[in-house]
Amino acid sequence: MRSIALLAYSMLDELVSSQSVGQRLAAISILESIPNPKYLLWLAHRVAVEKPFVAYHAAVALLNAARNLRASNAQEVQKAIEVAWENLDRAEWKDPAQVSVLENAKKELNWTKEKGKG
């Protein structure tokens, strides 16, 4: 799926707004490969509303955004990670894999801040 991210990128707006979980998963997969600040909050909300498999991949997309957008969009990424955490905190069951990925995303941002101080 990720190998076609560049080819399918032009369909991202359509995939994001789709009622089909498969198409939303395709959008998430594209954003895992090609992070876009426009969709950070959309990804953060997927953590709350999608089934665990899809929500996990939304968290991975946020982790990749933290790694790739931290220099240009650190505040937006931080806000999205915070929203994802809030959504996860409201969930009846917290997927340990999602928790781990979001913790790593937060560490990525903090690492960048610490590197900038040195």
For the regions a language model picked out, list residue spans one by one.
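Eukaryotic acidic, Ser/Thr-rich intrinsically disordered low-complexity regions
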Residues: 78-118
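Structural detector for internal amphipathic alpha-helices that build alpha-solenoid repeat scaffolds
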Residues: 1-3, 14, 22-35, 45, ...
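Alpha-solenoid helical repeat architecture
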Residues: 15-19, 47-51, 85-89
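Amphipathic alpha-helical scaffolding segments comprising HEAT/armadillo-like alpha-solenoid repeats
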Residues: 4-15, 36-47, 68-83, 115-118
